[in-house]
Amino acid sequence: MTEHEIREIVDVIDYNEITGIDICNVLNDALKGQDFRERELVTAMPINFMVDGTTSIRDPKGLKGSTLETRVVISTVPKEPLYRILEVLKLSGVETVDISFTSFGDYYTVKNKNYDDVVGAIINIGEESTNVSVFNKGIQIKNSLIPVGSKNVDKDLTYVFKSNLEESRKLKEKFAVALSSLADSNDTWNFKIDKDTSKEVNQVGVSKVVEARVRELLKLAKNEIKNLTNREIRYIIITGGLSELAGFSYLVEQEFGFVAKVCNIKTMGIRHNMYSSCYGTIKYFNDKLDLRGKHYNMISNEDVEKLSSTDSLVTTSENVISKVFGHFFVD
């Protein structure tokens, strides 16, 4: 991923009111002259807007003015690997509307007014790797990938206790405590090594293995933040499925201090940190469209009318609801 800042200014169409069209125009003009032959544009994130020289306006829609200026951070990636992913989605019957970085989604999940004014970092512990991103006033300025993730914990448990990977994952998610000092030596777990052999482990032993790997991972992420920036970090958010481990927040506090905290998604139905990138990406996409005065809906206007009509038959409404949920749940 490559990022750099550009600046552009355009004349406003109607002095009496700046609209989403004006914002689209200034952002599109900012991209003119950029070399996208080898790289694909992923995001054009406006830092701020200026109306007739007035600075630090986040959303100028509705204001009066003759000129609109912006500073934009653009992010690009190599075309070839991205196009391979898009081709797989196309063959799967999935329409690609837009592309984004998962780190943007993580930020929009935890985004608030305080974070929009300072420098901070977000750590997402994935299955195969850990993503470390640094944000300045809500704009991603640095990003790095550590090739260690939650699956490494599963492999450690498999190596130590001779369990298969599936059983190791259950041990990690349902039995282990991230901080072994909080574990109970009297709490045990039984599992089969093969059809004739069973094994019993206690919570302290399992938790020590988990803690060792998770602590190492957090130290790697901490060092990576230092490598990415020398600015003062005002917040650190840790997310990803592994952050749901029992006692994880205590381990985070030991490694980072009170500057760090674990993501806490409160939205009903997705109260798990494994969804942070997906949930935040939806919010980011909606915010992006709102700034440009645009809207996107997965449901057609006809279906909306059927769903809201009091004259519709119950069966019709049920069909529409099924269609809506069909976008998210497939048998």
Predicted features, each with a name:
Residues 1-121, 164, 178-186, 193-196, ...:
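Nucleotide/phosphate-binding catalytic cleft detector across ATP-hydrolyzing
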Residues 115, 252-257:
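Short, solvent-exposed amphipathic alpha-helical segments in soluble enzyme
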Residues 218, 222-235:
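Phosphate/pyrophosphate-binding loops at sites that engage ATP/ADP/AMP, CoA/4′-phosphopantetheine
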Residues 177-179, 232-252:
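Glycine-rich phosphate-binding loops at beta-strand->alpha-helix junctions
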